[in-house]
Amino acid sequence: MGSPIAASFLLFLAVQLLGQTGANPVYGSVSNADLLDFKNLLDRLEDKMPLEDEAESPQALSEQNAEAGAALSPLPEVPPWTGEVSPAQRDGGALGRSPWDSSDRSALLKSKLRALLAAPRSLRRSSCFGGRMDRIGAQSGLGCNSFRY
């Protein structure tokens, strides 16, 4: 009875040793030629696509930031109201408009909003996950624009 068990155990070991497959089949399935082809493909793609950092020079970025900063500057300072009404205000304004006519102000606000929309992405706020993430996500920038200047 011991000899059939010993013989089957030896046969099992022989089959295991001869037909042993690699422990990591992923490594065996990719050849060196495939890896070289993939590397060449990546090199060609990198040559065709310029990096974002190289696409815009630092001088161009600083000019864009200066333009956006000028467009986002606050409204001109208004002197404090003394409680007195000037004759021009009493008569309806110097040009026949009421003092509450805001066509100039709305035009100024429209131009500032257009400048804000045309501003570079670094000036816009990210609204990912409601603007605030807890613990790990807030520190790592996962899922958000982590490039903040």
UniProtKB/Swiss-Prot annotation:
SMART domains named among the record's database cross-references: NAT_PEP (SM00183)
Residues the record lists as Phosphoserine modifications: 127
Keyword tags: Cell projection, Disulfide bond, Hormone, Phosphoprotein, Secreted, Signal, Vasoactive, Vasodilator
GO molecular function: hormone activity; hormone receptor binding
Cellular-component GO terms for this entry: cell projection; cytoplasm; extracellular space; perikaryon
Region (Important for degradation of atrial natriuretic peptide by IDE): 145-149
Keyword check for Disulfide bond: yes
Propeptide section residues: 24-121, 91-101
Disulfide bonds: 128-144
Signal peptide residue numbers: 1-23
Site location (Cleavage): 121-122, 128-129
Positions of region (Disordered): 49-103
InterPro entries (alphabetical): Natr_peptide (IPR000663), Natr_peptide_CS (IPR030480), Natriuretic_peptide (IPR050787), Natriuretic_peptide_atrial (IPR002407)
Record PTM text: The precursor molecule is proteolytically cleaved by CORIN at Arg-121 to produce the atrial natriuretic peptide. Undergoes further proteolytic cleavage by unknown proteases to give rise to long-acting natriuretic peptide, vessel dilator and kaliuretic peptide. Additional processing gives rise to the auriculin and atriopeptin peptides. In the kidneys, alternative processing by an unknown protease results in the peptide urodilatin.
Lineage top rank: taxon: Eukaryota
Pfam families documented for this protein: ANP
Gene Ontology terms describing biological process: cGMP biosynthetic process; cGMP-mediated signaling; female pregnancy; negative regulation of systemic arterial blood pressure; neuropeptide signaling pathway; receptor guanylyl cyclase signaling pathway; regulation of blood pressure; vasodilation
Family affiliation: Belongs to the natriuretic peptide family.
Protein name, UniProt field: Natriuretic peptides A
Natural source organism: Canis lupus familiaris (Dog)
